[in-house]
Amino acid sequence: MGEGQEYEEVLGAKNITIEYEVDLIDQIWEDRPSLSKKPCFFLEDKYTGENVASKLKRVREKMAEYGATVHLIASLDDNAWLLNFRGDDIDFFPLVLDYVIVRKDSVDLYIDDSKLNDRIREEMAKNNVNIHPYNDIYEDAKKIGADEVALIDPMKMNYALYKSLPCKVVEGANPTILMKAIKNAVEIENIKNAELKDSIALTKFIYWVKKNYDKMEITELSASDKLTALRAEQEGYIRDSFEPLQAFGEHAAMMHYAPSKETDVVLKEGGMLLSDTGGGYYEGSTDITRTTVLGHITPELKKYYTAVYRAMQHLSAANFLYGNHGWSLDVLARQQSGI
């Protein structure tokens, strides 16, 4: 939205208007895939630690502070947190394509309702959440009364939806951003449980690699599949939390390298396997990186590994002063190796 406003200001000075209601790409993309139809699931209180009614109450209190009568939320993570449901519309993210309008006494949810199960429908009805077709959001936004005041987050709202509003607009960060960032006691305990489950799976994986790399052919891709399978053994596993990054040997020097059929290599004696992976569970998501040494490695590899470890250890112990940038802290990492 913010970028659109900037274009509007610059182009308006030259008498150029922005046509935001025409999707030119849609007109020429003949084989455009349809939107996801994957089902959603409700996240119960034992995982969230707070029910939908409580969250809506807190959001409405913040709306009142802004003097807002309606609040449009276009960010998927905020909507998922607010209404306590998750989905699988985006690879590796438990999110659902939707929009939400919070009003004083009701909520409008714009979503493909074929994704919703009975448990979600029950909870939505209990909290006076009205369900509408996903694509109706733009026309319905135009129908918001001119006497209403809409709270929107300019960093999380697209330009077309913003321009559809006929009422007064108050700009501010979505209240849900800070709310979901502050974890309650139930969430904290669940995060610990998710990390414990993930640690069990990763420990089994490292043991398996070390015991079998010289007895059977293990590649980067088959190692990824094995770790995913071990995570899936844990209760509450949903999916990997991002694309597994299994990098062996020189591949480990490449930032965010992910193996493919074209680049896949076999794990061998004398190398190191870098595993940057994560698991998604009902309790939370993990992101963990570990390096596994296969057999005996050269003094040179030991030197480089130790240098990286010492750099991270030193940097992690530093006090990050307000206003610091990454480049100003880089010296703390490099000085451990005299560079």
Give the location of each predicted region.
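Active-site neighborhoods and metal-handling regions in enzymes and metal-associated proteins
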Residues: M1-I339
